[in-house]
């Protein structure tokens, strides 16, 4: 068995980290340019590789007129920083729940956290709701977001590099036994610069600012700007669909509501973050920073962005089916997690009278009945099922935008207010590469987390964990994986 302090590589080690650090930002730009409101999703030129040329592709994508310099602007930078400043203000002035985290590895002491992201998001959404009531779909916030999407994406990416480089360099000022309780994450002390920068070196970097006080950067980024921004992006795409077609489709409303619930429920239960590996084990590096402020808001809103250009009509049966899938996933996720939490708190509760468990040498018990007798991480199965309704409303995605006056007919043809037509054409189902990427990625992420958890539990419980795995054979999906 490895010593606890012996780091091990994840995500392909230094080579994989290099690919992610420099490749993912390019991928996000490609996803936006390739699935667009100019020519189609994917852009028609991409469907014919034999005749593909840069000149042809450039004419079919929203490439800025200014060229590369158009990917950023000082105006967008100022407003993005204003958004972060607003989030900081709400963090500081609104009532908050003060919670102690888990005990740190080296000092054995907990850090204090301030949580009020739910109420802060509600305030921001309320303000936008009032603005929408006054201005309708032309509310300046909604039009500005969709008009400056590429600049917002690029500026957020640059901000990711700034934050992650700063936290990496700052981590070398940590001294053993420091009174600020600063620690280096176990996984971020390999000595390989690119890997440690990617995975995160300092466990819980904090900064003290005038008026705002002490801020845990990792927890703040995890629960605030990206998650709230995800909802705001979705709302801006709903408004765009209305401006484009004069109506709002049931599909975009269903996705926006489900995703808003997902975000708000997580923010309402913000204190639950403190037991997650993101907080207890992972340092703050490129991986978490990028995920929090770029990957989550911009990738996870792809479906609403798609539907803003090509509305899909589900009908009552379709809406009911999507809602049912979400509720099933939510039930599995919540029920299994609640069962585990209750067992940890009160293993002698009558609810566990007929359930089996393993008594470990550490003195704790591992539940091998109920949900946790079906799979070691059955909660991850529920979480993944919850992700499917984010993508399913886009159906067999893909569309081509045709000029006004084009002679084409069919039930799946949508006509914009400016006369342009949108039809699946040869693009379907290639658009699924864009709209279903989230669900595929989330499945990969959960499998990766399960592997990390398995390693951590093996280190923690030793032979007891091997016994547990013999009794509970399946990792996530009973009978399959």
Curated annotation (Swiss-Prot):
Q: How does it sit in the membrane?
A: Multi-pass membrane protein
Instruction: Report the principal subcellular site.
Output: endoplasmic reticulum
Q: Which InterPro entries match?
A: ERG24_DHCR-like (IPR001171), Sterol_reductase_CS (IPR018083)
GO process annotations (BP): ergosterol biosynthetic process
A Pfam match: ERG4_ERG24
> Could you say what a knockout of this gene produces?
Exhibits significantly increased sensitivity to amine fungicides, including tridemorph, fenpropidin and spiroxamine, but not to non-amine fungicides.
Q: Drop me one GO molecular function for this one.
A: Delta14-sterol reductase activity
Transmembrane stretches, start-end: 11-31, 80-100, 125-145, 149-169, 244-264, 279-299, 313-333, 427-447
Q: Which UniProt keywords apply?
A: Endoplasmic reticulum, Lipid biosynthesis, Lipid metabolism, Membrane, Oxidoreductase, Steroid biosynthesis, Steroid metabolism, Sterol biosynthesis, Sterol metabolism, Transmembrane, Transmembrane helix
Q: Which reaction does it catalyse?
A: 4,4-dimethyl-5alpha-cholesta-8,24-dien-3beta-ol + NADP(+) = 4,4-dimethyl-5alpha-cholesta-8,14,24-trien-3beta-ol + NADPH + H(+)
State the compartments where it is located: Endoplasmic reticulum membrane
Q: Name one GO cellular component term.
A: endoplasmic reticulum membrane
Instruction: Answer yes or no on keyword Lipid biosynthesis.
Output: yes
EC number(s): the record gives 1.3.1.70
What family classification does the UniProt entry report for this protein? Belongs to the ERG4/ERG24 family.
Additional detail: In Fusarium, the biosynthesis pathway of the sterol precursors leading to the prevalent sterol ergosterol differs from yeast. The ringsystem of lanosterol in S.cerevisiae is firstly demethylised in three enzymatic steps leading to the intermediate zymosterol and secondly a methyl group is added to zymosterol by the sterol 24-C-methyltransferase to form fecosterol. In Fusarium, lanosterol is firstly transmethylated by the sterol 24-C-methyltransferase leading to the intermediate eburicol and secondly demethylated in three steps to form fecosterol.
Q: What is this protein called?
A: Delta(14)-sterol reductase ERG24B
């Amino acid at each position: 068995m490895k010593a606890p302090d012996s780091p091990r590589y994840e995500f392909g080690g230094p080579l994989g980290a290099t690919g992610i650090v420099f490749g993912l930002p390019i991928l996000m730009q490609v996803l936006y340019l390739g699935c667009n409101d100019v020519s189609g999703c994917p852009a028609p030129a991409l469907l014919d590789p034999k005749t593909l040329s840069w000149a042809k592709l450039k004419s079919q994508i929203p490439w800025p007129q200014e060229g590369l310099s158009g990917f950023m602007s000082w105006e967008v930078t100022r407003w993005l920083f204003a958004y972060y400043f607003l989030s900081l203000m709400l963090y500081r002035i609104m009532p908050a729940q003060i919670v102690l985290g888990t005990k740190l590895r080296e000092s054995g002491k907990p850090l204090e956290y301030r949580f009020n992201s739910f109420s802060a998001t509600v305030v921001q959404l309320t303000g936008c709701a009032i603005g929408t009531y006054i201005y309708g779909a032309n509310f300046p916030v909604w039009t500005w977001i969709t008009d400056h999407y590429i600049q917002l994406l690029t500026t957020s990416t640059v901000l990711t590099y700034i934050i992650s480089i700063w936290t990496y360099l700052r981590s070398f000022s940590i001294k053993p036994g420091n009174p600020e309780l600063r620690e280096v994450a176990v996984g971020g002390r390999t000595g390989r610069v690119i890997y440690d920068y990617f995975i995160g070196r300092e466990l819980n970097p904090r900064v003290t600012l005038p008026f705002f006080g002490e801020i845990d950067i990792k927890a703040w980024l995890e629960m605030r700007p990206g998650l709230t921004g995800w909802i705001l992006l979705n709302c801006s795409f709903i408004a765009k669909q209305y401006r484009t077609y004069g109506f709002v489709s049931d599909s975009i409303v269903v996705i926006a509501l489900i995703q808003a619930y997902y975000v708000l429920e997580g923010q309402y239960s913000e204190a639950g973050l403190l037991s997650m590996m993101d907080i207890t084990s992972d340092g703050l590096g490129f991986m978490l920073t990028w995920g929090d402020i770029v990957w989550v808001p911009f990738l996870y809103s792809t479906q609403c962005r798609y539907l803003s250009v090509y509305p899909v009509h589900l009908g009552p049966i379709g809406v009911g089916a999507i809602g049912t899938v979400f509720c099933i996933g939510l039930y599995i996720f919540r029920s299994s997690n609640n069962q585990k939490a209750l067992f940890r708190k009160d293993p002698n509760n009558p609810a566990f009278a007929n359930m089996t468990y393993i008594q470990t040498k550490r003195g704790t018990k591992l539940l091998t009945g109920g949900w946790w007798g079906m799979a070691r991480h059955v909660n991850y199965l529920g979480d993944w099922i919850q992700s499917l309704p984010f993508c399913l409303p886009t159906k067999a995605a893909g569309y081509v935008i045709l000029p006004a006056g084009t002679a084409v007919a069919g039930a799946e043809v949508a006509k914009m207010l400016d006369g342009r037509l949108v039809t699946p054409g040869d693009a379907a189902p290639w658009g699924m590469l864009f709209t279903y990427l989230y669900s595929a990625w989330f499945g990969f992420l959960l499998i990766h987390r399960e592997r990390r958890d398995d390693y951590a539990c093996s280190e923690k419980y030793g032979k007891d964990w091997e016994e547990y795995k013999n009794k509970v054979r399946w990792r996530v999906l009973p009978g399959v994986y």
